[in-house]
């Protein structure tokens, strides 16, 4: 049965094994186009130690996929990966994390990824750090944190606080606009991947269409890029993606995604002052985006059938 409580538990605190993490990463943009290739040596050096890690970057830089890769390349790959999303923790969820005997903080020999620590209040950050230290969580597990920095700004103070207290190593994920020279290769590799998942084939993209993509600001970075290119590929009725199609999509995108909006890394908290149907649909949409549009994995994570998922999306 689909319930808010069950769904929130699956989204806020998630446990995954190696095979599930491999599946998630292999279908991600980072894996498909090799975005972490430039950071390979940095990641290898980080994994030579058991020090806590702080992953940071702008919104939409797919930090969770970078953490998946970090986990898979580490000596902890055969133990569970636990993901705690601070942004989706309500009062009960926070109390569970801090006080419950089954809290992830009571685990041992796990990789624990606590994401979006920058959305916590100062008191919450202090409580979390105090519990981690008092319970030796960092000595019994591999700890990874993440935070979001604003455009062209350094790590936020919340992230710096954790880095200093926990002696974290840091992994910075550059924004998409810093890879403009690699844009044609990234687009074409992703289109090749999409061709394996669609019933039609897209041969490529017009030169002017590529220039328009390169000039776009991409405020939500890779998560926005992946969604837009996938939409262009699925909607085109021609062998190539045209400049007109790109212009239309980007114009619409600019009107609904303002610069500075928080992307996949920090979703807006659930508004519970709505009907049950509206809240359920919001949860489904968030999970669908996390699963890169894969309806089968979304239904499995939410504990519902694909038919139920389809009906909830349609309503």
Predicted feature locations:
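Helix-turn-helix-type domain boundary/helix-start signal
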Residues: 118, 203, 216, 270, ...
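Hydrophobic residues on the short alpha-helix immediately C-terminal to a glycine-rich phosphate/catalytic loop
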Residues: 69-70, 131, 228, 232, ...
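Conserved post-Walker A coupling segment in P-loop NTPases
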Residues: 42-118, 175-180
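Acidic-aromatic/histidine active-site loop/patch
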Residues: 2
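Bacterial C-terminal helix-turn-helix
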Residues: 59-63, 68, 123-127, 151-153, ...
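Intrinsically disordered, low-complexity linkers and terminal tails enriched in Pro/Gly
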Residues: 252-269
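Active-site-proximal alpha-helical element of nucleotidyl cyclase-like catalytic domains
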Residues: 97, 133-137
